[in-house]
Amino acid sequence: MSLSAETKAKILADFGRCENDTGSTEVQVALLTAQINHLQGHFKEHIHDHHSRRGLLRMVSARRKLSAYLKRTDVARYTAMIQKLGLRR
């Protein structure tokens, strides 16, 4: 259940610092957020899919750690990213 190439390209264009930016913290958090949102729809249909739920929890944890890193290093970029993604603090 990965994201389509078009979705990834749109996220890279929206959150990347330059044209070929694929590794900045904002891009990583945005990609994880898109995957998490995609999986939430999957779990509405497949309630007992515990194997995938474990992967979802790993993604949520990774997103939380990356967000904490960005907040620690550059608060302005962190707040802009949170507002753009519509995440809670």
Swiss-Prot record:
GO terms for biological process: translation. One of its GO terms (molecular function) is structural constituent of ribosome. CDD domains: Ribosomal_S15p_S13e (cd00353). It comes from the Bacteria. InterPro entries: Ribosomal_uS15, Ribosomal_uS15_bac-type, uS15_NS1_RNA-bd_sf. One of its GO terms (cellular component) is cytosolic small ribosomal subunit. PROSITE patterns: RIBOSOMAL_S15. Gene3D superfamilies: 6.10.250.3130, S15/NS1, RNA-binding (1.10.287.10). Keywords: Ribonucleoprotein, Ribosomal protein, RNA-binding, rRNA-binding. Part of the 30S ribosomal subunit. Forms a bridge to the 50S subunit in the 70S ribosome, contacting the 23S rRNA. PANTHER family: RIBOSOMAL PROTEIN S15, BACTERIAL AND ORGANELLAR (PTHR23321), SMALL RIBOSOMAL SUBUNIT PROTEIN US15M (PTHR23321:SF26). Belongs to the universal ribosomal protein uS15 family. One of the primary rRNA binding proteins, it binds directly to 16S rRNA where it helps nucleate assembly of the platform of the 30S subunit by binding and bridging several RNA helices of the 16S rRNA. Forms an intersubunit bridge (bridge B4) with the 23S rRNA of the 50S subunit in the ribosome. HAMAP family: Ribosomal_uS15_B. NCBIfam families: S15_bact. This is Small ribosomal subunit protein uS15.
